[in-house]
């Protein structure tokens, strides 16, 4: 047992268990003020959640070497800057649920992960790595979108950090008061394999339309 804390939020004690032999074996146990057992989070060990979080963290650290680099030619220093990488790993029940619409088809199945297994993070990145990039730029155009997307692909290729797809938003910089206008280009799940110069602007225009249709569908479902 690593530590016990008291939560004023729920009025309970939480004991945090750290396994000395399992990198995915950490969990917590909750007790009432009278010492009665309430619940535990051991399911996160058994269902692959802990393993997924470990892999996600390792991939995030890889992508951060580029996206948090002070030398990045795009502003990543503002409080509203959004640039990160993630692995798309989800429970099978969510992947199979027809009412869940925000899980990409290329997602890895959390239930299939092996406890404590040392995975090749770059290999997983090539299968399910997802970049989320919000870029501030004075010019909002399909041509600028293509140029910047090619630039990011080049940076990740040179660093040998694979990804499968990117979400990309091109928007105007905010004012000194932190305000922004509504003009932007927004693309969801643009595949790495489609980021090449020949015909890129055409593919981007199609992706813009598909992304707009996706959000329109979500609005209709509200």
Regions found by a protein language model. Name each.
Residues 1, 71-75, 158-163:
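Short secondary-structure junctions
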Residues 1-31:
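Exposed beta-strand-loop-beta-strand "reactive/processing" segments of non-cytosolic proteins
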Residues 8-15, 91-92, 175-185:
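Short, solvent-exposed polar/charged micro-motifs at secondary-structure junctions
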Residues 23-27, 138-144, 175-179:
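Short, surface-exposed beta-strand/loop "edge" segments at domain boundaries and coil↔beta transitions
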Residues 25-46:
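A short, surface-exposed beta-strand/turn
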Residues 40-125:
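Non-cytosolic head/periplasmic domains of membrane-anchored proteins
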Residues 145-222:
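Extracytoplasmic/luminal low-complexity segments enriched in Pro/Gly and acidic/polar residues
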